[in-house]
Amino acid sequence: MLVGREKELHLLHDIQNDDSSHFVAVYGRRRVGKTFLIREAFGYRFAFQHAGLSEGGMKEQIYAFTSSLKDAGYEVKKQPQNWLEAFEALKDVIRLSSEKKKIIFIDELSWMDTQKSDLMVALENFWNGFASARKDIVLIVCASATSWMLSKVVHNKGGLYNRLTEQIHLRTFCLRECEAYVKAAGLALNRNQILQYYMIFGGVPYYWGFLKKGLSLSQNIDSILFEKDAPLRDEFKYLYASVFKKPENYVKIIEALGTKKVGMIREEIITATKIPNSGDLTTKLEELESCGFIRKYNAFGMKKKNAIYQLMDCFTLFYFKFLKSEPTDEHFWTNQINTPAVNTWLGLAFERVCMEHVDQIKFKLGISGVLTEVNSWYCKSDPDNGIFGSQIDMLIARKDQVINLCEMKYSQSEYTITEKVDRSIRNKISDLRVVSGTKYAIYPTLITTYGVVENSYSQELQSVVMMDDLFA
């Protein structure tokens, strides 16, 4: 069942019907649906398809590639000894194909690029010297190692420089797309339940496929994560290992960021992980960011050299909070409902979901067309200078000289702004003005699930964004 992806499907269908050859790179995080999209788009019909091995050296990779050549109907008379020979055989498969458009799909390309294999040399030769000279080939390469795809294919500085005709960065579902999936699957979940499931798994389509009819949301979560043989109980063990060949230091970074809600600057990461300050650390941070596990941002008014790295992956955050301790209660989630631990987590997770739906928030605020920067901001208390000490998790700084200071509050009913909350908002506005020196107008903005209870304090809000608006 393919839900959403209309833009990507339209592009792939146009490519198939075009009268020239195309070289397409498809990338995105693990389990986002890249392979499924490509198979559905082309009706599972390929002149040749192959998936790299997660383990194995050059010899094993070429052997598997040769097996795929045989599956395509090619009679292999001699086992290829290198990638140049393997791609020569692929040329013969194409020459023998009767398909009007020869769709060549190579999945998990990064796994095939073993040490000193010269895979990219052979791929370059295949495209530049053969496929691009024809009009009937669509070459699609795909990998979950987003950073590898970006450096080796999309931004290739060698023979494949500027050779891609299309690239598709397949992103996770937004809430609207998850709701469409739930409806298509015939699941009876309301928007608050969809939101809560999103807080755990984000918009990764694969995870949504485990929901079962007839079970409540909490029963589903227990079945998927906490029962003895739950299918995703050990997911964290594979999440990073499947993307990075040597995941240990990546996981160290993730674990360090998981201890600090607002994130860490580079120096703090070095101190926490004991990873040396080097270009290798820079690469690992960039790779984690490109895969969507973390985000890099600059606190409002701060210099770029003090960039902050923040853990964003919903499942990883949930793992650290509830799964890392390996609870033995098979009904753990059902029994944890309305506990302080879960209520605290709901608030933090809701903030992350809001950060992933900035476009929807901007649409509700009527500023979709306004150039903006989305930041977080904090300052320490300094009573002598009238500074209270504030942490603001979302600031939308607008080109029209307005800042939306966003308070994100998860609630099971309409949210009530008390005197304490009102004072906190006023203090944040004051701190932001004093410390940053901004001259922008500051609009207090509430983002919550079911709106706000009308009282004297709520009148001070400039805008209210509700859960339904995040589904736009």
Per-region residue spans from a language model:
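Conserved small helical "lid"/interfacial subdomain of P-loop NTPases
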Residues: I168-Q193
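Conserved catalytic cores of phosphodiester-cleaving nucleases, focusing on short active-site segments
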Residues: V358, S390-Q412, I425, P444
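Conserved P-loop NTPase "ATPase switch" module shared by AAA+ and STAND
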Residues: I94-L119, L123
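Conserved NTP-binding/hydrolysis module of P-loop NTPases
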Residues: Y44-K77, K91, F318
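Accessory nucleic acid-recognition modules appended to NTPase machines
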Residues: Y206-Y207, L211-I392
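Conserved lysine of the Walker
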Residues: K34
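Sensor-1/coupling segment of RecA-like P-loop NTPase cores
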Residues: Y27, R31, W111-Q115, L119, ...
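Domain-level recognition of nuclease-like catalytic cores that cleave nucleotide substrates
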Residues: T438-A472
